[in-house]
Amino acid sequence: MRVILTGCAGFIGFHLTKKYLDMNFTVIGVDNLNNYYSKKLKKDRLTEIFKHKKNKNFIFCKTSIDNYKSLKKIFIKY
């Protein structure tokens, strides 16, 4: 299975990403890493995801969900 998960560096998205990876899903994580709260915290979460034992199933796309062209490319590609 494959999922596109928005906000993958946020609190809920981070935990969902790890859970989906544990379930052997391919996760396309979308996040713009805005400064709503600590960018360092978000980057640390991404680092932890990339260290996950099934990290080969994780694809990160840095973009905003309000960027239609970028999201369209992601949906077409994956």
Model segments located where?
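N-terminal Rossmann-like NAD(P)+-binding domain of SDR-like oxidoreductases, especially those catalyzing
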Residues: 1-78
